[in-house]
């Protein structure tokens, strides 16, 4: 696994996302990585997250909206990482390559137990210059609890406030 999270490579001006922004202390602070040390091919991505009690749906189980949020942020972070890879650029170099969610589809497979570390695995389905499709599985205790598909599109210039 790489040592620096994808989200930690985002410019400060683009790091305020509730789900993954390093500058949002009230947020989830999700951190995504390449699953293996081989970052030269479109491999798998991985993230881990342990829900706090405030994300309870009913006692003992995680709120589904949290799972959707984690899938969303792991998907867009994975899209940014593969875009940098495809451009033969180091993550964090300017101009930024950031992606936003164009579509999110989540299927809940099994109840997600509270108190377990969640593992998110991202698999690339389609990679184009301005669009990346990532499938994400969320597991707890080695049981798949949710699956999601994120269609991520390159962030429009109108949203970028970064000066190169």
What name fits each language-model region?
Residues 1-12, 110-164:
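HotDog/MaoC-like acyl-thioester-processing domains
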Residues 49-51, 108, 154:
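Hydrophobic residues in beta-strands and at strand termini
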Residues 27-29, 48, 101-105, 119-121, ...:
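Conserved beta-strand residues within beta-sheet cores
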Residues 1-58:
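Non-catalytic linker/capping segments at the edges of enzyme domains
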Residues 77-119:
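Hydrophobic beta-strand-centered segment that forms part of the acyl-chain substrate-binding groove
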Residues 41-42, 46-82:
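A conserved, well-ordered hydrophobic junction motif at loop->secondary-structure transitions
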Residues 39, 60, 109-111:
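Exposed regions on extracellular, virion, or secretory-pathway luminal proteins
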